[in-house]
């Protein structure tokens, strides 16, 4: 089976639809254009949305790909940008209010937030657990309130 990759026009159309929905704080009735079936296309949509908004990336969220999607996407993990404007730093006893999309999707996830002090240095064999561990300055508990217009 040949996978149908998204065209540049489709990538832009998906990104524009999500950016407009987020800016208008309104849900989407369905996925715009068509659902990407390749991880590279999903990343391209994400990059186009960042370009359209001009948002600054504060960091990256690393997540596991659900087991049924690992073979089709040829990936076990993926990384997505954390928008600096949505990052809230607070004391442990603080009460924080965040908006979610009415009619969209929302979830709360516990996270480990890793702050790197130095850039990890790859070794001849690539990055190792030791080279990454040596670069870690802090590990914090975090909460992600994930919300999407879809």
PLM features per residue range, with description:
Residues 2-150:
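Catalytic-core "active-site belt" of small-molecule-metabolizing enzymes
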